[in-house]
Curated annotation (Swiss-Prot):
InterPro entries for this protein: MFS, MFS_dom, MFS_MCT_13, MFS_trans_sf, Proton-linked_MCT
Origin species: Mus musculus (Mouse)
Gene: Slc16a13
PANTHER family: MONOCARBOXYLATE TRANSPORTER, MONOCARBOXYLATE TRANSPORTER 13
Keyword Transmembrane helix included in the entry's annotation: yes
Function (record text): Proton-linked monocarboxylate transporter. May catalyze the transport of monocarboxylates across the plasma membrane.
Membrane topology type: Multi-pass membrane protein
Cytoplasmic-side positions: 1-10, 395-428
Keywords (A to Z) from UniProt: Cell membrane, Golgi apparatus, Membrane, Symport, Transmembrane, Transmembrane helix, Transport
Protein name: Monocarboxylate transporter 13
Length: 428
């Protein structure tokens, strides 16, 4: 395979964008709409909210904690077979969940099996996309991740309609059929070889260098805090609205309102990330702060109009932070280490995904409402914003990628691994 000196910034990369669009829809669109099933599981198994919340949390955590496996396999085999295998596992998990007779079955089928499929699907696709773009990376990420917004808008009322007509078991069977389309997404991922790949060494050397890289560790800590509160509305907003007296279908529709705003936010932020001078991390900090504030204000709102405004605000800002979050990482670790870097980030931030929803459910069980749940979720995002302030060149007027001097080459396991001088190993 011929090595390219630079990412092509187009060409087949747009087909990778298309693949990532549908892949993100079929992974996080399903996860974000899972609050509709949450109410059904509580009623069907007569369990507390905290225990039912573990279904989505295990799925999110397994998807993220297993990401290094998907990354390592993609480094060896290429992303195509890995993603196609992930599609099979995701569909199989939903299929088995439709026959569940206890929460344990749902933990294993949706949480473990489908989560494993998502781990082999999401990270390799997004890492592959990062390698195809440089100057237009944020825009490409924004367009690809609009799949989450569009599917969240469509899936929440669709899933509620399916539940009303086929019960939750029949609805899960149809979600399984949808998940099989991840195989087609994987078939579109053509491997790309870059000259930087020859200099970064094997996966072991890459992981060792990343774990000693101060800016990478701080960025990972920030995303872990953000991830803890990020998914709370998509798990508990429907239940919160029903506590306020809303009917299930209008409550699910409010998730769709947030999803439309999310869609606009992803495209707008993707364009701004490439167009506005300065480090992309600064834009990420802005969107994260606004998302945290909107989350904390949800319990204050009582009127329907106010809740709609907050849903629009949360949808836009939470959608806007996603593409720039993926754009910051290649600036810190380089495209040659993007598979390992993205997999490692996803694994570590899975701690937040694992604890977020159960913590929210626990606070609901203790206090009797979701006020503390949303306030604490917002606080986690604001804490993540504070950590982002410590990244290199945050207060610079130029981007990280254009401010780097000549790379410093560091020996690790007899392999030369370049890292930027001002971001050297061991920096704290």
């Amino acid at each position: 395979m011929v090595r390219r000196a630079e990412p092509p910034d187009g060409g087949w990369g747009w087909m990778v964008v298309l693949s990532a669009f549908f892949q993100s829809a079929l992974v996080f669109g399903v996860l974000r709409s899972f609050g509709v099933f949450f109410v059904e599981f509580v009623a069907a198994f007569e369990e507390q909210a905290a225990r039912v919340s573990w279904i989505a949390s295990i799925g999110i955590a397994v998807q993220q904690f297993g990401s290094p496996i998907g990354s390592a396999l993609s480094t060896k085999l290429g992303p195509r077979p890995v993603v196609m295998t992930g599609g099979i596992l995701a569909a199989l998990g939903m299929l088995l969940a439709s026959f569940a007779t206890s929460l344990t079955h749902l933990y294993l089928s949706i949480g473990l099996l489908s989560g494993s499929g998502w781990a082999l699907t999401f990270t390799p696709t997004m890492a592959c996309l990062s390698r195809y773009f440089s100057q237009r990376r944020s825009l490409a990420m924004g367009l690809a991740l609009t799949g989450v917004g569009i599917s969240s808008f469509a899936f929440a009322p669709l899933f509620q309609w399916l539940i009303n007509n086929y019960a939750w078991r029949g609805a899960l069977l149809l979600v399984s059929a949808l998940s099989l389309h991840l195989m087609a997404c994987g078939a579109l991922l053509r491997p790309l070889s870059l000259t930087e790949d020859a200099a970064v060494g094997g996966p072991g050397a890459q992981i060792t260098s990343l774990l000693r890289h101060g800016p990478f560790l701080r960025y990972t800590a920030a995303l872990t805090l953000i991830n803890t509160g990020f998914f709370i509305p998509y798990v508990h907003l429907v239940a919160h609205l029903q506590d306020l007296g809303w009917d299930p279908l209008p409550a699910a529709f409010l998730l769709s309102v947030a999803a439309v705003s999310d869609l606009v936010g992803r495209v707008a932020s993707g364009w701004l990330g490439d167009a506005v001078p300065g480090p992309v991390a600064r834009l990420l900090m802005l969107w994260t702060t606004l998302t945290g504030v909107s989350l904390a204000l949800f319990p204050v709102a009582q009127a329907s109009s106010t809740l709609v405004v907050l849903a629009v605000a949360y949808g836009f800002t939470s959608g806007a932070l996603t593409p720039v979050a993926f754009s910051v990482l290649p600036e810190l670790v380089g495209t040659g280490r993007i598979y390992c870097g993205m997999g490692l980030v996803q694994m570590i931030e899975s701690i937040g995904g694992l604890l977020g929803a159960p913590l929210s459910g626990y606070l609901r069980d203790v206090t009797g409402n979701y006020t503390a749940s949303f306030v604490v979720a917002g606080a986690f995002l604001l804490a993540g914003s504070g950590v982002l302030l410590t990244l290199p060149h945050f207060f610079s007027c130029i981007s990280v990628s254009t401010s780097r001097p000549q790379d410093l080459v560091i020996e690790a396991s007899d392999t030369k691994i370049p890292l930027p001088k001002e971001e050297g190993l061991g920096e704290n």
